[in-house]
From Swiss-Prot:
Lineage, uppermost ranks: Bacteria, Bacillati, Bacillota, Bacilli, Bacillales
Subunit structure: Homodimer.
Pathway info: Cofactor biosynthesis; coenzyme A biosynthesis; CoA from (R)-pantothenate: step 1/5
Name of the protein in question: Type III pantothenate kinase
Organism of origin: Bacillus cereus (strain ATCC 14579 / DSM 31 / CCUG 7414 / JCM 2152 / NBRC 15305 / NCIMB 9373 / NCTC 2599 / NRRL B-3711)
Cofactors demanded by this protein: NH4(+); K(+)
Amino acid sequence: MIFVLDVGNTNAVLGVFEEGELRQHWRMETDRHKTEDEYGMLVKQLLEHEGLSFEDVKGIIVSSVVPPIMFALERMCEKYFKIKPLVVGPGIKTGLNIKYENPREVGADRIVNAVAGIHLYGSPLIIVDFGTATTYCYINEEKHYMGGVITPGIMISAEALYSRAAKLPRIEITKPSSVVGKNTVSAMQSGILYGYVGQVEGIVKRMKEEARQEPKVIATGGLAKLISEESNVIDIVDPFLTLKGLYMLYERNANLQHEKGE
C-alpha cells in the first residue's frame, strides 16, 4: 500500500493506493505549527478508521508547496512509518520536458498534475487546478510542459472583498438562484462565482489562441466541480488528479531504483 500526501497552502490531501487504485482519501487543514508527533497521531487515527495501520504502508511520496512543513512531515514518516518518503522536487524522475526559463520554479503540484494529465488524458492539454492559487498549465502535443498562468484563487478573491469592504458579510460560495442578485448575499455570490467563471473562460480562450490548438481542458481542486458546471470550456473534472499523479511518480521512481539495484 502506498501513502500519498499533497500539501497545499490551505489544505493537505492524503490518500492510500492499493494495487493502483485509490482506496481512501482525506483532507485536513495545512498547519505549519504542528510537530511530527501531532501529524503522526492524526494520520494514525485516519488510518485506523479504515482498519489500516502504519505497517500496511510500504512506500510514501510527498508533494508540498509549503517548505516550512516538510521537516515535520519527513520526520513523521521516518518515526511512525519507518519509511523515508520520496519528495517531489530536484532529483525525482518525472519524465517531463519542462520548457520554463527556470524549471526549478515550477511548483511540485503543477508537475504532479502534468504527469497525471498526460498519462490519463494525452496531449495537448490544459490543466486548471483550483487551489489557494488557481494554476493553469499547458502541455503541448509533444508532451512538453510549456508553462502556464497563476491567479489568485476564488477564496483569496472573496477574502479580499470581505476585508476591504466593511459592510459586506462573509458568504458561502455557491450558485445563486439568478445572476442578478436580489440581496447583498446573492449579489456577492453571483459576482464571485460568475466573475471567476469569466476569468477561467477568458484565460483558457487566450491560451488556446496562443497555442493555436484545441487542447483538452482538465479541472481539479476543491471548487472544480462548481466552476465546471457553470463553464463551457472545461472538458473533464478529475478531483483526484494530483493524488493519481503522486502515485504514478512513486511507481516510476521505485521502478527505476529497482532496475538500478538500489
